[in-house]
Amino acid sequence: MKLFLLTLLLVTLVITPSLIQTTMAGSSFCDSKCKLRCSKAGLADRCLKYCGICCEECKCVPSGTYGNKHECPCYRDKKNSKGKSKCP
């Protein structure tokens, strides 16, 4: 039993850093893409929030500050509870 727990602990310690790096890399990707996407938005903080949510789920952000949603169908097809586009 002790050997099993020790093995599980070692595996967890080896895997955890790689998962953290992957998450951080995804976040920096989304942060930079959303910063560009929301650079001309009137409500930049709201734009950045929803762009970040959509980017994390879809793994892409359309180019430019407006439109071009055909480049990322997942981003384009996300809707809020009112049926409007969730992603800026």
UniProtKB/Swiss-Prot annotation:
Expressed in tubers, stems, axillary and young floral buds, sepals, petals, stamens and carpels, but not in roots, stolons, shoot apex meristem or young leaves. Its main location: secreted. It is found in: Secreted, Cell wall. It holds the Pfam family GASA. GO terms for biological process: defense response. It comes from the Eukaryota. Residues 1-25 form the signal peptide. One of its GO terms (cellular component) is extracellular region. Induction: No responses to methyl jasmonate, ethylene, abscisic acid, salicylic acid, isonicotinic acid, indolacetic acid, gibberellic acid and infection with incompatible bacterial or compatible fungual pathogens. The keyword Methyltransferase does not apply. Has an antimicrobial activity. Causes a rapid aggregation of both Gram-positive and Gram-negative bacteria, but the antimicrobial activity is not correlated with the capacity to aggregate bacteria. Belongs to the GASA family. This is Snakin-1. It comes from Solanum tuberosum (Potato).
